[in-house]
């Protein structure tokens, strides 16, 4: 395991329980859900937009560009983007990361 320190827990709280951070050149979306901290690649697999709408009731995150929705626990795309009906598309998931609170700072396991 290679834990990397990111932002303070207070910064996550101030951002409404969701935040995107840069860890070694990777943008990672972190959200505090009802069952703890979750992290996943913050770049949508459809059009490379940054994710940003965490829905705690469904434990999903939505891409603000085209509406694709991903499970925060698995990274699986559960709702494809809203694009032209005949547009070619792959339902690619996102990498998930373990996240922990260590002495008031969020750490991400980048392995």
From Swiss-Prot:
Signal peptide interval: none
Residues of the Rieske domain: 3-108
GO cellular component, one term: cytoplasm
S-S pairs: none
Keyword Iron attributed: yes
Classification via PROSITE patterns: RIESKE
Single GO term (MF): metal ion binding
Cofactor: how and how many bound: Binds 1 [2Fe-2S] cluster per subunit.
UniProt binding sites for [2Fe-2S] cluster: 44, 46, 63, 66
Gene3D superfamilies per record: Rieske [2Fe-2S] iron-sulphur domain (2.102.10.10)
Domain of life per record: Archaea
Cofactor(s) needed: [2Fe-2S] cluster
Record keywords, A-Z: 2Fe-2S, Cytoplasm, Electron transport, Iron, Iron-sulfur, Metal-binding, Oxidoreductase, Transport
Cellular localisation: Cytoplasm
NCBIfam families from the UniProt entry: SDX_Thmprot
Sequence similarity: Belongs to the SDX family.
Listed name of the protein: Probable sulredoxin
The species this protein was found in: Thermoplasma acidophilum (strain ATCC 25905 / DSM 1728 / JCM 9062 / NBRC 15155 / AMRC-C165)
Gene: sdx
């Amino acid at each position: 395991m290679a834990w990397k320190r990111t932002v303070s827990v207070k910064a996550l709280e101030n951002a409404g329980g969701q935040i995107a951070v840069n860890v070694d050149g990777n943008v990672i979306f972190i959200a505090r859900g009802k069952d703890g901290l979750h992290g996943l690649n913050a770049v949508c697999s459809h059009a490379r937009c940054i994710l940003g709408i965490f829905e705690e009731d469904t434990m999903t995150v939505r891409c603000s560009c085209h509406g694709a929705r991903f499970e925060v626990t698995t990274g699986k795309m559960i709702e494809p983007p809203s694009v032209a009906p005949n547009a070619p598309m792959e339902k690619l998931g996102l990498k998930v990361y373990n996240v922990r609170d260590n002495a008031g700072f969020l750490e991400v396991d980048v392995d």
